[in-house]
Regions:
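Short, basic/aromatic-enriched C-terminal tail that caps enzymatic domains
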Residues: 194-199, 222-223
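Short, charged beta-turn/beta-strand-edge "cap" motif at the junction between a beta-strand
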Residues: 116, 154-158, 200-203
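Extreme N-terminal starter segment of soluble prokaryotic enzymes
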Residues: 2-4
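Histidine-centered metal-binding segments
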Residues: 203-227
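Short beta-strand-centered segments at strand-helix junctions
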Residues: 6-55, 61-113, 118-151, 162-195
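A generic signature of intrinsically disordered, low-complexity regions enriched in glycine/proline
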Residues: 59, 168, 184, 207-211, ...
Length: 227
């Protein structure tokens, strides 16, 4: 696979502020690293927090909940990232957003051993994205904030194209694409898998003559690579 990009599955998790962390776990509490993540300086902490959703069938019944890992370091806002499947199971409203874009997003309750915090916003389904350094972006011919299509080859030869994947560029990043667990299941994303940027427009190898069966784009499986 040419110009391959490592594809990683990002399972549900929580980011918190230091203030929220101390409400949940007690004054002066600090996150401790359990496992370093692929992005420099990021880590899965030893702490887990209970995310409490809403019982939509019976508002007076027990509220669904799940324990999620807290990722570090602490941030300047609280954010809960789940898949659509998680959101349904927990009765949460979770719009697709880029990380940090939480205004008007879903609400929930966070519960720790020392206290609870009601979040009026912050629950999202993270938009699939690619972390790139400026050098990576130049090599791939893309810009920060650009939406691209990525062909991912999962296990068992399952080929899946993920459109509307946003490119995020920073010298602090390391090249990797992040998808959630729903997307990973769709492409049989177990183990180490890779993707490559493709174009959905251009010369087509089937009889739609490059206009797709809906009149737009390329519909065949032979997608055209960005040079």
């Amino acid at each position: 696979m040419e110009n391959k990009i490592l594809v990683e599955t990002s399972a549900r998790h929580v980011h918190v502020t230091q203030e929220t962390l101390e409400v949940l776990f007690g004054a002066g509490h600090q996150l401790e690293c359990r496992k370093e993540l692929s992005q420099p300086g990021q880590f899965a902490s030893t702490d887990r927090v209970t995310v409490i959703g809403y019982n939509k069938k019976d508002p007076n019944g027990p509220r669904p909940q799940a324990a999620l890992s807290i990722l570090g370091p602490v941030r300047d806002h609280n954010q809960v990232e789940v898949s659509f499947t998680d959101a349904r199971q927990l009765g949460l409203e979770a719009p697709v957003r880029e990380s940090g874009d939480i205004k008007g997003s879903g609400k929930c309750t966070l519960k720790g051993p020392a206290g609870e915090v009601d979040l009026e916003e912050g629950v999202i389904v993270a938009k699939r994205h690619i972390h790139m350094t400026p050098e990576d972006a130049e090599a791939f011919g893309v810009e920060n904030g650009q939406n691209v299509a990525v062909l991912v080859e999962g296990q068992g030869g399952r080929m899946t194209v993920f459109c509307d994947t946003v490119v995020r560029v920073s010298p602090k990043y390391k090249l990797a694409m992040h998808i959630d667990t729903d997307e990973s299941n769709a492409c049989c994303g177990s183990g180490t898998i890779y993707g490559q940027l493709v174009s959905l427009e251009g010369d087509c190898d089937c009889d739609c003559e490059g206009e797709g069966h809906d009149g737009e784009g390329c519909c065949c499986g032979h997608h055209h690579h960005h040079e």
